[in-house]
Each structure stands twice: as C-alpha cells, then as structure tokens.
Curated annotation (Swiss-Prot):
Record-linked CDD domains: DEXSc_Pif1_like (cd18037), SF1_C_RecD (cd18809)
Region (Disordered): 362-408
InterPro entries from the UniProt entry: AAA+_ATPase, DNA_helicase_pif1-like_DEAD, P-loop_NTPase, Pif1-like_2B_dom, PIF1_helicase
GO molecular function: ATP hydrolysis activity; DNA helicase activity
Organism, as annotated: Invertebrate iridescent virus 6 (IIV-6)
Compositional bias ranges of the Basic and acidic residues kind: 388-403
Pfam families reported in the protein's UniProt record: PIF1 (PF05970), Pif1_2B_dom (PF21530)
Family: Belongs to the IIV-6 030L family.
The protein's name in its UniProt record: Uncharacterized protein 030L
Biological processes per GO annotation: DNA repair; telomere maintenance
C-alpha cells in the first residue's frame, strides 16, 4: 500500500489501515496526541489517489474538530439538525432538506468517517443506524455504509440530553452503549498507544496516569510544581493561552485584554472575511467545482462560518496576542495553534506577527520577499485581498533575525496574509470560498474548543471542572511540561468514568491477545512444499 514516505506505521496503525482498506467498519481509539486524525487523513489521501469512485464523508461531532480534519459536522452533513425527534421525523426532515439532496447523500455514501465519536450520544447513533437502513433500503448494519470512527472515551464525554436521549439513563452514557454498536463495529477496535504529541517520556507517563485516574505521589508532586511556576512564564512576551472550563471566562478575558490595548491608545484594524460563490466561468473551468443557487450557498457558507475556528470578523491591533488557525509550514512549527503577538502592520495593512518558533532555520529560503513582490501578488483577487497563501517574508523596516534579547531568541516575525478555504457542498464539490486573515484572538480558549489541538504554551485554570476527562483533556494540549502552568487544581477533580476504564481494560486485553497470536504465527517455520 502506497503511503507518504515520511510516514512510518507502527503495528497498531498498520492493523487499523488494513481494516479500513478492506472496507471494514472500525473504531480507532487512543490517548490524546496518538495520531488518530493523522492516520485517517492518510487513509483518505490513499483513497483519493487509488479509489476515487468512493464517496467518503469526513465529519466530526464538533465544529472545531471538523475544521481540523477538513470536514463538516456530522449533524449538518447528514441533514439531521439537532437530531431530536423520532426516527420517522428525521427521515422526513432528511428527504425535505435541500430539495432531496440530503437523501441522495445518504444513498450514495460509501464511507462515513466520524471523528470525536466519543462525544456522540448513543441514542443518536442508534437513530442514525436505523435511518441509514430505511433510506438505503438495506438490512445491513448502518445500511451498508462503511464506518470509520475515532475518539477517546476518557476525554470529554457525550453532551447529554439535547433532545436525543434520556440524560438520566446511566446505561446509555457512551456511544459504545448504543444498541446497534456491536453489530456495526464488532471487535474491530484498534487502540493506538504510541503518543506523538509529547516527546518527553516523563510527561507522557504523567499524562497516561492522569488519563486513567492514577493520581499517585509522582503525579501530585509534578503537578504541584507546575502550579508554582507562573512567574517564570509571565516574563515571556507571548503569554500562555489561558484555558477555562466555561465560555464566559474566555470571552471576558479576551475582551478585557483588548480593552487594555484600546485604552492605551492602540489603533485597531478590522478584517472582514470575503465569502463568495464561484462564478459560472469558474465552475466550467474546474471539474471539482459545482453550481449552486444563492440560497444554497447562503446556507452552506453560514454553516462553514459557524464551524470555522477563523472568525468572520477579526479586530486586532499592535500588541494583540493571536493564534494561527491554519498550517503555514509544518516543518518549521508554524501550524494551527501557533501563538504570537502582533508587532505592527505592513503598508498593505496586513499584520506582522512575532511567533515563538524553535525551528526558524527551516524558513530561511522563504525570507526574501519585498514590497514589490507583495504588490505583484495583489492584482488578480477581488476586493483588495492579495492572491496566495500567507507568506513568510522580511519586513522592509525590520529584518527577520534573532534578537540579542535572551527571552526572544526563539522568535520569528512573519507577515500574515489572507488564506483561502474552499466551501464545499455535501458531495464534496467546491461552490465558493472563504478568505480571511488566519488569526484569532488567543488570550483564552475553552478546554472544549481545543480538544484535538496542540498548544505551544498554556495556563490551565481548572477551578470549574465538572466532567470526567476534563482535566486530562486540558493538560494534554502542550508538548512538554515546561510549557504548562496549572491554576486552581483540586486533585479530587481528576475524574475518570469507571465504565470507560473497564472498556479500555477489555480492549487492551483483546489487542494483547491478537498480538500474541500474530507473534506466534510469525515464529512458525512453514515448509514451502507443504
């Protein structure tokens, strides 16, 4: 099987990929940072190259994770709204949605990928399974659609209630409790155990203990140390992003920090996203594009904006702390989640951001642009947005170089230019685009919104933890312990659901047994003439 040559598969990943390529249903589960999404992305790349006839839906249970994997939310893609109502109600809703387009989506679908499936209500999973059989006229599990599911039952749990089930039914707490789960997935469950996000063995060990609720003396000692080192990180120009449990605190902190800048006399610049439907000519010259009505485009573009981590309206000034919402250069570490501070604006009013960057030399060949290069890039796009991705370039007045300041010797200054995201219909055809500066204000985020993301530095406020897995999800966002500050942690708030723990004990036992059988078979010396 051809894969990216830079991507090496371990045994667990190889088994998962084999099952996916055999059109088997599968649940890929793992601790945070173990590469669940990366594995699925490589599978999708393989299918696009070798089996383009397959109709694959890439979805997630949350808008943030949907954007991270380049897909749509499950609810919007399948046309089920909030998922409330009876099965009959939902079938009728699907048939009427977009003049029957959603029904056609269900009928033509080959493979349904659901990321963060661990946050899917089990009652809703059962509804979707029955709906698939009704619409497709098939008695096969999920109507014959291949399911590729990924998630972690020990991170953030299912959102209970919401019209999809009885929030007091303790026997239906996880998607794996769904009545149709066993017939859909069976024993095709692969547990990935190799952590890729954190390279520090000590940090990995601590996180894995927290994940399963093993709060021994080592964990208490290490976490206590990181509750006392706040002053050290405060000296940095780029402050750690604060993670809160509640949205209210996030909005309050972001607003108050911007207000301080405004009161100090900083001048703000507004960037409004350009959202545009492709013209008839643009559709005719590209097979990957499709026509749509203005009403359809309005619906799909509104959905995109709602799910996007990039704000439609961005208001920033010099001194504002921001976060990248797009991967500019993965080799250099300039990726979705990289944080920086705006230090000025170019003549064309694009922000110059000073990013923390430990792999600066990888970008050296790109640091050669001039003002003339910028102007030449700006001739072919509408409404003042220059063409192309954001560029890494020299500021005409400020050379890109390391400073003599010891605290700033790992930084890099970039001009951040608009990025284009293409808006697709439910068949994967491109119908228009969303163009915006790929930045967001990043003094604070919710723990929920950063599940699946990696942060270069974080200060985690755990004063309002209320869910199983919430502390583990928050603490596993950074790559190392030195990038983490912890506030208001009560060790009793580190909770793991006992049934989730039992699920993983069972899976590990099953996977160990499979490995033992495979090792035994590989040691047998078969006679070729047998």
């Amino acid at each position: 099987m051809e894969l990216n040559k830079n991507y090496k598969l371990n045994k667990q990943q190889s088994r998962a990929l084999t099952l996916m390529c055999q059109d088997k249903n599968i649940f890929i589960t793992a601790p945070a940072g173990a590469g669940k999404t990366l594995l699925i992305n490589h599978y999708c790349d393989y299918v696009r190259q070798h089996e383009p006839f397959k109709k694959i839906a890439i979805t997630s249970t949350t808008g943030v994770s949907a954007i991270l994997i380049g897909g749509s939310t499950l609810h919007s893609y399948l046309g089920i709204g909030l998922g409330d109502g009876t099965i009959e109600d939902l079938v009728q809703r699907i048939k009427k949605a977009s003049k029957g387009i959603k029904e056609r989506v269900w009928k033509e679908l080959t493979t349904l990928i659901i990321d963060e499936v661990s946050m899917l209500n089990p009652v809703l999973f059962d509804k979707l399974e029955k709906i698939a059989r009704i619409i497709r006229g098939s008695d096969l599990p999920f109507g014959g659609i291949q399911l590729i599911l990924s998630g972690d039952l020990l991170q953030l749990p299912v959102v209970k209630g919401g019209g999809t089930g009885n929030k007091n039914d303790h026997n239906m707490e996880f998607v794996t409790d769904a009545n149709s789960w066993k017939k859909c997935i069976g024993n095709n469950i692969v547990l990935l155990t190799e952590i890729m996000r954190q390279k520090d063995f000590h940090f990995k060990e601590i996180l894995l203990k927290i994940r399963v609720g093993n709060i021994d003396q080592q964990v208490r000692s290490v976490l206590s140390q990181h509750m006392k080192k706040e002053e050290k990180l405060k000296k940095e120009e780029i402050q750690p992003t604060r993670l809160f449990c509640l949205k209210k605190y996030v909005q309050d902190l972001n607003d108050s920090e911007l207000k301080k800048l405004e009161d100090s006399g900083k001048k703000f610049i507004n960037f409004n996203a350009l959202i545009k439907k492709y013209s008839e000519e643009a559709v005719l010259t590209n097979k990957g594009r499709s026509r749509c009505t203005d009403l359809q485009f309005k619906f799909l573009s509104d959905r995109f904006v709602k799910d996007s981590t990039t704000p439609q309206h961005l208001r920033v000034c010099e001194g504002a702390q921001v976060m990248l919402t797009y991967n500019i250069d993965q080799l250099s570490g300039l990726v979705n989640g990289s944080r920086g501070v705006i230090i000025g604006f170019t003549e064309m009013k694009f922000p110059i951001v000073r990013f923390k960057n430990h792999k600066r030399n990888n970008l050296t060949p790109k640091l050669n642009k001039t003002n003339e290069d910028i102007k030449s890039d700006s001739t072919s796009q509408p409404q003042g947005f220059p063409e192309g991705n954001r560029r890494v370039m020299e500021n005409p007045e400020t050379k890109v170089s390391k400073t003599d300041d010891e605290e700033m010797n790992d930084t890099l200054e970039l001009e951040v230019r608009p990025q284009t995201w293409e808006i697709c219909n439910d068949f994967g055809k491109k119908i228009g685009y969303f163009k915006q500066i790929p930045l967001k204000i990043a003094y604070a985020l919710t723990i929920h919104s950063c599940q699946g993301s990696t942060l270069d530095s974080a200060e985690v406020d755990l004063s309002d933890t209320f869910e199983h897995g919430q502390v583990y999800t928050a603490l596993s966002r950074t790559r190392d312990l030195n990038s983490l500050v912890i506030k208001n942690l009560c060790f009793d708030s580190i909770k793991c659901h006992p049934r989730a723990l039992q699920f993983y004990d069972d899976i590990k036992s099953m996977q160990d047994a499979i490995s033992e059988i495979e090792n035994s078979l590989s040691e047998l010396d078969f006679d070729d003439d047998f």
